[in-house]
Amino acid sequence: MRNPFQFLWYWLKKIAISVIILWIVSVVAFSFLPVPFSMVMVERQISAWLSVNFSYVSHSDWVGQGQISPNIALAVIAAEDQKFPQHWGFDFDAIESVLERNQNHSGRLRGASTISQQTAKNLFLWDGRSWLRKGLEAGMTFAIELGWSKSRILTVYLNIAEFGDGIFGVEEASKHYFHKSASKLTASEAALLAAVLPNPHRYKVNSPSAYVLQRQQWILRQMRLLGGGSYLEKNGLMKDD
């Protein structure tokens, strides 16, 4: 008779191998196929159902980069990851800076996630701050940096980023808040959307706080300093994958 621990270990290995294979297939498939949903969307939907909130629905509408305004692409880079074109998924200078700042200040720790890390985390992983999830996030980040172009990473990020309660992706956010497609977003509208990205449940696009409005103006200045639309073209971020 098989030892129950051996039986459990056998199935745990089976599950782990299956998950790894699924991740590999997903990385390859999503390098060219539209992403239908992210793990964050699934997690939010299940959480709503468990809370008996059946009115909640995760909305997302995939669009290719050719249907996304350069303004929003530049805005999220200016707001979230200005070294995005140069790094291989990790901004070690930002990580070091955040570690020093967190050591000197009490309270909630701040992160230093790049756009690549946020894409890997939101697309493939559950929410949380465990070392296991961080390790998996690092591996998935390296995988998409290796297998996808920077343009593709940015396109996927813009399609799965959360901009409000049940609002995922720039197309859905643009329609919901501004009643237009993502291709028609102005610089000011794009900066406002990017301003809530750190915490779209705390910061609101439709009722922005003074902090959000200040952040919007800061993002607009950073967009100009980066060079506007020419920055995207110069760094090969305008290719429609």
UniProtKB/Swiss-Prot annotation:
Q: Which domain of life is it from?
A: Bacteria
InterPro entries documented for this protein = Glyco_trans_51 (IPR001264), Lysozyme-like_dom_sf (IPR023346), PBP_transglycosylase (IPR036950), Pep_trsgly (IPR011812)
A GO BP entry is: regulation of cell shape
* Alphabetic keyword roster: Cell inner membrane, Cell membrane, Cell shape, Cell wall biogenesis/degradation, Glycosyltransferase, Membrane, Peptidoglycan synthesis, Transferase, Transmembrane, Transmembrane helix
- E.C. designation(s): 2.4.99.28
- Report the pathway entry: Cell wall biogenesis; peptidoglycan biosynthesis
This entry's Gene Ontology molecular function terms read: pentosyltransferase activity; peptidoglycan glycosyltransferase activity
The record's subcellular location field reads: Cell inner membrane
Work out whether the entry's keyword set contains Flavoprotein: no
One GO cellular-component annotation of the UniProt record comes to: peptidoglycan-based cell wall
Q: Which reaction does it catalyse?
A: [GlcNAc-(1->4)-Mur2Ac(oyl-L-Ala-gamma-D-Glu-L-Lys-D-Ala-D-Ala)](n)-di-trans,octa-cis-undecaprenyl diphosphate + beta-D-GlcNAc-(1->4)-Mur2Ac(oyl-L-Ala-gamma-D-Glu-L-Lys-D-Ala-D-Ala)-di-trans,octa-cis-undecaprenyl diphosphate = [GlcNAc-(1->4)-Mur2Ac(oyl-L-Ala-gamma-D-Glu-L-Lys-D-Ala-D-Ala)](n+1)-di-trans,octa-cis-undecaprenyl diphosphate + di-trans,octa-cis-undecaprenyl diphosphate + H(+)
Q: How does it sit in the membrane?
A: Single-pass membrane protein
Pfam families associated with the record: Transgly
State its role: Peptidoglycan polymerase that catalyzes glycan chain elongation from lipid-linked precursors.
In terms of HAMAP family, this protein maps to: PGT_MtgA
Protein name (record): Biosynthetic peptidoglycan transglycosylase
From what organism does this protein derive?
Photorhabdus laumondii subsp. laumondii (strain DSM 15139 / CIP 105565 / TT01)
Specify the taxonomic lineage.
Answer: Bacteria, Pseudomonadati, Pseudomonadota, Gammaproteobacteria, Enterobacterales
Gene name linked to the record: mtgA
